[in-house]
Amino acid sequence: MAVPKKKTSKSRKNMRRAHDFLTAPAASVCPQCKSPKLPHRACASCGTYKGREVVKTEEI
């Protein structure tokens, strides 16, 4: 079993973990209904994508 020969310093440990953070998803605004939506996807509230209705949504 492999065992480290020297203690890993706090600096080296933190540099190794520097890229492990989570990034927030990018959000854009739907031009039709002005609700937030993910880019390159149809709007969840109105069902439009690039000015066309691609998903039928029922009004409640």
From Swiss-Prot:
Keyword Ribonucleoprotein: yes
One GO CC term on file: large ribosomal subunit
A single MF term (Gene Ontology): structural constituent of ribosome
Gene3D superfamilies per record: Single helix bin
Keywords from the UniProt entry: Ribonucleoprotein, Ribosomal protein
Any single biological process term in GO: translation
SUPFAM superfamilies, alphabetized: Zn-binding ribosomal proteins
Protein family per UniProt: Belongs to the bacterial ribosomal protein bL32 family.
Name of this chain's protein: Large ribosomal subunit protein bL32
